[in-house]
Amino acid sequence: MHPLALEILKKHWGYDQFRPAQEPIIDAILQGKDTMAMLPTGGGKSLCFQVPAMVKEGVCLVISPLISLMEDQVRNLSEKGISALALTGNIPFYELERLLNNVQSEAYKFLYMAPERLNNEQVLYRLKHTPLSYIVIDEAHCISHWGKDFRPSYLECKRLREWFPSLPIVALTATATDRVQEDILQLLQIPKAIVIKGSLARPTLAYMTYYIEDKWERLGRILTKNKESSIVYVRNRRLTEELAQ
């Protein structure tokens, strides 16, 4: 493991070492390899690309599907003293120019944006003239027709290899079948990417299936017996209100 990566981990995140599944991902990124990594939710995927970006020169471009996710990561990075920007919402031309000027001058270490931004010629032109370290496709399963969370806008990411042929591409996901994995590699044009799979087992979660006649009576017994936090899914808002009473 790169010694500077460990220093950055300790300084900004307060940890002494990486999780076992994180180390090979970070090593691959630091070596400049195209990488596809699969880690469970809560497995520390963001750290896998954030730490190497702090080691490398340039701005890390992150494509993400959700505004809330981008804003949350930018806030967390800012609280750690790390400069990050998310291009969200309808930004006036002059304001977008100002922000992109700052990006081009490397005022930010991380630039987050939705895939739709890649359709903006103003943004794309500036990106091509910005010293980027590598490109991260977060929630990469959204690019696949075979995935349940397919987003057509993610298909814009297919052109990233054409636009930035020398930049490493890092695809991250918490869930991907073999077919979706193949789709990700093909569509992002990273067929020789290093593929790293962490265990998707969640030891803190337990799943059980019951066949019951009176579901509300059984639910009451389960909740009474289980003293820990519980989540109950129902079909509509009316049922949530009835259940809460």
Regions found by a protein language model. Give the residues of each.
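Conserved catalytic helix of short-chain dehydrogenase/reductases
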Residues: 68
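Helicase motor core with emphasis on the C-terminal RecA-like subdomain
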Residues: 3-12, 16, 20, 24-36, ...
